[in-house]
Regions:
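Conserved, structured core segments of small domains
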Residues: 1-125
Length: 125
């Protein structure tokens, strides 16, 4: 079963982090992604740039509306996603617990409903 691990955490100003903290974070995520890959459960992984680089788009009454910043103004920001292919929710929970972001934010687990592969939508359940 495919699960998305959605990473949410407060985004500190990069200037408040030491070089050592940044390197520790990169190393932790590298080790985590490597463990997922070595276990054969990693579909893909993306860590997003900060919310300062976000742009939100909507179409209201046929008119394009573009806004700087994220869609929602929340304390925690959506910061990344890991797509896993594991046996069940318990396996996804075990991997979410090991995610470095779980130590300073939240890892939301959501099962995939459908995916687009080879030109067609396919059920993932």
């Amino acid at each position: 079963m495919r699960y998305a691990l959605l990473i949410h955490y407060p985004q500190p100003a990069v200037s408040t982090l030491t070089e050592h903290q940044i390197e520790e974070g990169k190393a932790a995520f590298h080790a985590y992604a490597r463990a997922l890959d070595d276990a054969g459960v990693l579909g893909s992984a993306e860590v997003l740039q900060t919310i300062a680089s976000a742009t939100s788009v909507s179409v209201k009454q046929g008119k394009l509306q573009v806004q700087d910043g994220p869609f929602a103004d929340t304390r925690e920001a959506f910061a990344g996603i890991f797509m896993l292919d594991v046996a069940d929710l318990d396996a996804a929970l075990a991997w979410a617990e090991k995610c470095p972001a779980a130590q300073w934010g939240t890892v939301e687990i959501r099962p995939s409903a459908v995916r687009f592969v080879d030109g067609a939508w396919t059920s993932t359940s």
